[in-house]
Amino acid sequence: MKTGRHNIGDDTYFFATSGERQTINRRALVLGETSTRAVPIEDVNAMEKVFNNQDFSEVVRFPDKTKSEIIAKMEELFKSSNESDVNYLYLTCHGGEDGTIAIGSDGQTFSGWELASLLKQYKGKFVVMLDCCYSGTIIDVGKPDKKVASKSEERFDEQAFLAGFSTGDVASKNGEMLDSKFLVLCASWKGEKSYSLVGVGSLATRYWAMGTGWDPLQNRMISPMADTNTNGKITLEKLYQYSYPLVLEDASQIHEEQHVSVYPKNSQFVLFQK
């Protein structure tokens, strides 16, 4: 059998050169820049619960940290990763129309190119779940010229907020995570904002959590809503198919559009298990 990951039934295994099956260690880093009302700490709370409800080797909650602190934490958590491992990175924050990810509490951002380059230093597969405006830029999904007006519920000047961030001289382009190393869920298309509701949290994060079996509103475990065939496996495609119509519907209630996006399409890679 060839080296690498192989699906056997509903499970994914990693085979080394010797042909022996190896254990897949999973670890998660939960990030959030929650200094403004539009990015609620409840997002971080929900995804921390999601990961802690799984049999992961390590889950690290790390919100409201500087860019340098985040980079150091990535090194600490992911440096021991093997090729057989799966690493999860969740980010909730503001995002710019140019694809910048405003995750640093010190006013520093990551470009998609910079984030992808950092993660490529480490062995293993990366599952990236990004809940921010224009997040689909990192996988080049959506309408690039779509302009979405700021909604009154945000109650702050988002462009002025983002103007305070600096990405330095790092080059940026679309589709930085279109790479076999990554499995990616984005809260919106590259031409759209990502919305949150008071008392609910961010729309995409809410349904990603519920899809895996955690209700962030009731703060309790539930049956995994994305497990449509009840086999106890939540694949990337299942979570995408579950969250996409619900986020779109909820956004329409505030007269906006928000399309969850995914890479790669139709992936049967198992992200979570019951």
What residue spans do the PLM features occupy?
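Cysteine endopeptidase catalytic domains of the caspase/legumain-like
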Residues: 23-274
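Extracellular adhesion/carbohydrate-binding repeat motifs centered on closely spaced tryptophans
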Residues: 1-22
